[in-house]
């Protein structure tokens, strides 16, 4: 079969393939270094017994049940040799058993005991705020907001809602607590509350919670690092290696007293190596942690890094929130085993929430708590929980794990009462809670709490607090404040953070180098533009412009720090919660690490610019210039860092920074000199650090110098006396040179005497903003607990919510979903699924890719089929290639070479194959602003064929909604997690979108149960079962099914590592067929109570059967394998005879790539994007606010520009300032386009929903109306303020030009982002192109003064034509009246009037005399009308409409280039391997 190269998001493909390859690499590594597999794998049986003995003795000493005089550890501890290589974690014979014995012995010898604590909570009630009903905001609701103030105020003060209701419990030192509950039941809130993470939450006054007698408030304030919470999301610095990440954590929590008197560094390195060995991370020591964009360790390894990092915090009490998500069952079990070991030996206590806990995991826990809609319905010994609920009247199905059973009783659709108990069992969460409170187990718990509190009474200043403080002081470093929760002193924290900051810089050196290179390029461009500027009066403006660019480019480079600070804020907050360091110390370290980087950038940039632009070549002037630019770089860095620290979101910070930059540029003193400033905004320049820096640079350049006059007035030969004057400001009659000091005083009101005063002001700004930054970083936290709630369209909210009545069993707590999970109603009508007859087969499919220059086979001769009415499971060990096979079969791979055969009914696949199949991806990608019904309708409209009417498609969508039981939230908005659909609802929508397309071949599903709890997983699989029973063909990858879940499937395709088949065939009743195959080929017998899926994973993971044969080889020689090939041949013969007869009836569209014609696609996609924009009021408001504020600010800064020469110049500069918001306009558009593109390229394009042309054109079209509105608003705010009311033609043209400018900005944004992978990359290109366009538009350097090389850039820059058209329209025929400082004043020769003396000069040069009849003090203005001024900068009134037309050419060019770039780089798949081969042959 020919190689298939279909499109998919390359990041998704790369991440998946790297993980699969790394998994196979890890397997090889683990075979060679088995000691790194797991904590349990490191200990022999004798060692386990010894440790268990030690652990049980420790547990007895801590337990209130056993007397305290139990014998201590055995004397075998003393027999360990300190030089034993078994305690070296890097050695091949490392033994965790012996290492732990050594540590225990050392601790005993030093008289230290591990710090231990338990936790007691009584009447523990936690509440949050959030409206029960949330409606979607739109542009119309935004505009009508002033008329709905009452409604908004009412919603703002919604009453608090209970999330946890009167919990009671006791977790002792050394115990493990399993937290069970369905998503939204309050598990995360419970774990956070145990650790004092109460952002956005509140505890009731009656709540009691303490740690062995220490109140929670005191605990969090002084002992924050003793109780830590591990969140579900992995947050790490991506560029740090695993070793650096974990060694940092170890150093931050290294105690003052250490084993063997190791130094801090030695201890941290040693303990890190041990933890890495325990969690199987030793082979990743020098590998970057990475993230979605930075290549690093695999997702499972990153999760283990998070676990290891928190383990290094050495906390006696830890809460783990679904920390096994993304880990396979074996790794998850080993993680819990490690917690068990740590708890037994160190006395630490752990509370762990796990969604799908296998029986082997469950059995490790001491206690379990079951949550039901925020209510506690059991808390007690894990071994007694099952019997408690069975006694309550519930039946546990055979082979169901205890964890699944306990969670299932909270699901009305899954729980099953024992015969005869149907009317006696509790039904609602309140009933369950009431039953629990009356039970003997509850009474026993309360009695245990009472006894425990007698031993550990709650006291503000008691023995427990004193013990905590003493133990903390023992491990705290010197000079650390006693009340501080941190182990390190502030200087030590700064030192540690600074080291890490430099590691981050070095590991991401390419970013620093690219910044330096971009600055070199900008310096070369700006320097060359002003190259050859004369040291004469003709160079005055050019020198000012050079220094203006210098100070701005040095200052504004720091704006990028806002994004970097926001990206690291979640990591810093996590470390702070672990009591690693003060956030302020990390902020200080960030500033310190920036010094050398900024120094290099400053030196490189300014060295090039200074000498290339011909600034004053004097050592004193150069070094002062360098000092000023370096200081202003740091001052502005402090300003932008402060912006990031005082705001809550990056959009707030960037919006604030955008307005700030505009104010800083305008009030620097160049485009609007101090004499021209208006009183209402004049105060800004006093608060502007750049103003003070610019005054220093100007004074430094011009001070103490006389500049030769370039042009005299009048320009007669043999001038003498006072009959002439230089044409520049500050000139005096009869002088042939102008003092630089006089020029800057007249033109700018600057003085050299202010230089060192300004330097002091800059230092004050630096210190002030740095202090605010450090304080704000320490105090401001963006972490908050948000309500998980559904959002509805206005006017479409469900009746029971609209009337505030409570739906039966509705979950009302903030953390809970706004309604019952969707899988609890009836079976759903499956009759709407059209019967299918097509059979999909594949034979000997192989998939090869190249990794690091080496060929790698990911799939190895896989064969199989999917028939209508069957549910086929695709399983395998981690990294076996399950998702890869699904992608290959669905034609969704974007790289590599596929060989083998794929057939539908025995015939090859045509281009309609992709749209004839449904593919439910693992990621639930949907348009956030659309409702569930709209998402389904969009899929049906574009993917069902044209012979189906629109009404029929809509009717089918309603059937799908009923079938998936989504009626209650059909009008709910998809939203984002927490504010929109929950995990299960998103998964159902993902399935629904594919069903709405009515796929006529089969349905692929990739991990449909990923991230779901066991009940939701069961509901999804039961639905797939019903789907298959109705005639649908289904192929589904599944990670780790329970025994009951496994029985839902008909067939199984099982892959071993490397994509090798080890079984394909029926599963059989109770998995008998599958078990018989493996057992007959040398596998051990599967026990009756064992999960066949786990059993099979275990034996295949072992690699070989009892005779040492590889399972892949066993399969290849088996009769079952031969039977597969025979069955494929039979299917082909049978189906080919059937399909020949039906081929004649096929419509032409049935073979086409897309179901619907292009114009229908374009209409539907454009309508959807319009709808999306309308429902994004924040985005639209940010656009309009930017336009309005910019227009008003520029308009009133340059208000009623005078008719003087400076007035003409300020009008042109005002246009320059309008152009300066161009970059912000582009930056607004690009992120939204990237979001749209991700959805299209990952889900909609591979499904052949619509064409890439429709996608691109629709996105360009939809921006235009909003850009037109933005142009109108900006025009109204800017134009009339600056120039007042002009004739209608001019007003109309300026309006058109304003609209045109914003349309150009949006098309430019699409052109820039079309081919780029992300906004960051595109932004760098945008900034460069924008800077060049702005520099060469003729405002800062006139075209006549440009070096010849750059003239082409003046002609290429679109701003040249836009500024020219705008300036000409506003200034044409305007009479100029020079201000007194602009007048050239001189005396005519005796006997002549001024008019007579100047007549010949004025006949050639133009201009005007204000006193032609005077015989002294002639007042000459060099310009009579504004057109004379404009012609000097190559701007002409006659070219205004031509320039307007040229701008449309640029807009069309942007659209054309966007289309070509998108097609070339993101649609067209180039055969690069073929090109390589051809090139190598030529060589």
Curated annotation (Swiss-Prot):
- Start-end of Polar residues biased regions: 71-82
Residues annotated as binding ATP: 876-883
InterPro entries listed in its UniProt record? AAA+_ATPase, ABC2_TM, ABC_trans_N, ABC_transporter-like_ATP-bd, ABC_transporter-like_CS, ABCG_dom, ABCG_PDR_1, ABCG_PDR_2
Q: What Gene Ontology cellular component terms go with this record?
A: plasma membrane
What keyword terms does UniProt attach to this protein? ATP-binding, Cell membrane, Glycoprotein, Membrane, Nucleotide-binding, Repeat, Transmembrane, Transmembrane helix, Transport
Q: Segment Disordered: which positions?
A: 1-92
Glycan attachment sites: 32, 123, 322, 718, 780, 947, 1146, 1413, 1471
**What's the catalysed reaction?**
(R)-miconazole(in) + ATP + H2O = (R)-miconazole(out) + ADP + phosphate + H(+)
Induction (UniProt):
Expression is highly up-regulated in azole resistant strains and in the presence of miconazole.
Q: Which Pfam families match?
A: ABC2_membrane, ABC2_membrane_7, ABC_tran, ABC_trans_N, PDR_CDR
Give GO terms: molecular function aspect only. ABC-type transporter activity; ATP binding; ATP hydrolysis activity
Q: Which domain of life is it from?
A: Eukaryota
Regions of compositional bias (Basic and acidic residues) in chain numbering: 1-19
The SS bond pairs are none
Q: Where are the transmembrane segments?
A: 512-532, 539-559, 595-615, 620-640, 654-674, 759-779, 1179-1199, 1215-1235, 1254-1274, 1293-1313, 1320-1340, 1444-1464
- Please give, as recorded in its UniProt entry, the membrane topology of this protein: Multi-pass membrane protein
Residue intervals of the ABC transporter domain:
147-398, 840-1083
User: Upon deletion of the gene, what happens?
Assistant: Leads to slight miconazole susceptibility.
Described by its record, this protein's role is as follows:
Pleiotropic ABC efflux transporter involved in the basal level of azole susceptibility. Confers resistance to miconazole and clotrimazole.
Name under which the protein is recorded: ABC multidrug transporter atrA
